[in-house]
Amino acid sequence: MDSNTVSSFQVDCFLWHVRKRFADRELGDAPFLDRLRRDQKSLRGRGNTLGLDIETATRAGKQIVERILEEESDEALKMPAPRYLTDMTLEEMSRDWFMLMPKQKVAGSLCIKMDQAIMDKNIILKANFSVFFDRLETLILLRAFTEEGAIVGEISPLPSLPGHTDEDVKNAIGVLIGGLEWNDNTVRVSETLQRFAWRSSDEDGRPPLPPNQKRKMARTIESEV
């Protein structure tokens, strides 16, 4: 049995015990108590699968947590703050642009725009966004630029629909790339986006998309105005 699996179960058991003590003092709200009940069932199932006694695992988990806390400073216990990363300058973010053949699609809480009159261009995607725990947290603005600096596409959050995940952003980027590539443009993304928006990309700095997916994405954005 993998040692990480065992220690993870032990720590989960102890943390559940701490939460149970908290609830016993009538300090937990309804969602807290609901999660406590669901997690209890989950721990019982995991204990049966692993063949481990929950009470014994709880004691072992307490020792693990105590060792960790002994090594932690007060500074380390602070919640890390999001980092704000910028591919674009203020001028690039605030510049007005227009489309000869405008196409627009709303995907969840993100709005995707592109100019389908653009053909046979080398295009780079740049974005300004915040990062939390080394993952994209909030997209501020993403724009597609030609080598000449013209803006030909954009992804922006909708003010009326706040909240999006890194997967939402990744999917929106895929739609934008598919639409631009439909017109024989070559699209790549900035190194910053490669690092935080997705974990795998090809040598051209863009996520690998099979031809059938690119065609599907292009048709999707083609049908939305």
UniProtKB/Swiss-Prot annotation:
UniProt comment concerning the protein's domains: The dsRNA-binding region is required for suppression of RNA silencing.
GO cellular component, one term: host cell nucleus
Organism per entry: Influenza A virus (strain A/Chicken/Hong Kong/715.5/2001 H5N1 genotype E)
Protein name: Non-structural protein 1
Ranges for region CPSF4-binding: 175-210
One GO MF term attached to the UniProt entry: RNA binding
GO biological process: symbiont-mediated suppression of host cytoplasmic pattern recognition receptor signaling pathway via inhibition of RIG-I activity; symbiont-mediated suppression of host gene expression; symbiont-mediated suppression of host mRNA processing; symbiont-mediated suppression of host PKR/eIFalpha signaling; symbiont-mediated suppression of host type I interferon-mediated signaling pathway
Oligomer status and interactors: Homodimer. Interacts with host TRIM25 (via coiled coil); this interaction specifically inhibits TRIM25 multimerization and TRIM25-mediated RIGI CARD ubiquitination. Interacts with human EIF2AK2/PKR, CPSF4, IVNS1ABP and PABPN1.
Chain location of the short sequence motif Nuclear export signal per the record: 132-141
Cross-referenced Pfam families: Flu_NS1
Ranges where the record places region Disordered: 200-225
Residue ranges, annotated region (RNA-binding and homodimerization): 1-73
The keyword Ribonucleoprotein is assigned to this record: no
Positions of region (PABPN1-binding): 218-225
Swiss-Prot/TrEMBL keywords: Eukaryotic host gene expression shutoff by virus, Host cytoplasm, Host gene expression shutoff by virus, Host mRNA suppression by virus, Host nucleus, Host-virus interaction, Inhibition of host innate immune response by virus, Inhibition of host interferon signaling pathway by virus, Inhibition of host PKR by virus, Inhibition of host pre-mRNA processing by virus, Inhibition of host RIG-I by virus, Inhibition of host RLR pathway by virus, Interferon antiviral system evasion, RNA-binding, Ubl conjugation, Viral immunoevasion
Compartments (UniProt record): Host nucleus; Host cytoplasm
HAMAP family on file: INFV_NS1
Family: Belongs to the influenza A viruses NS1 family.
Motif Nuclear localization signal per UniProt: ranges: 34-38
Function statement: Inhibits post-transcriptional processing of cellular pre-mRNA, by binding and inhibiting two cellular proteins that are required for the 3'-end processing of cellular pre-mRNAs: the 30 kDa cleavage and polyadenylation specificity factor/CPSF4 and the poly(A)-binding protein 2/PABPN1. In turn, unprocessed 3' end pre-mRNAs accumulate in the host nucleus and are no longer exported to the cytoplasm. Cellular protein synthesis is thereby shut off very early after virus infection.
Claim: Ubl conjugation is one of the keywords in the record: yes
Post-translational modification: Upon interferon induction, ISGylated via host HERC5; this results in the impairment of NS1 interaction with RNA targets due to its inability to form homodimers and to interact with host EIF2AK2/PKR.
InterPro entries per UniProt: NS1, NS1A, NS1A_effect_dom-like_sf, uS15_NS1_RNA-bd_sf
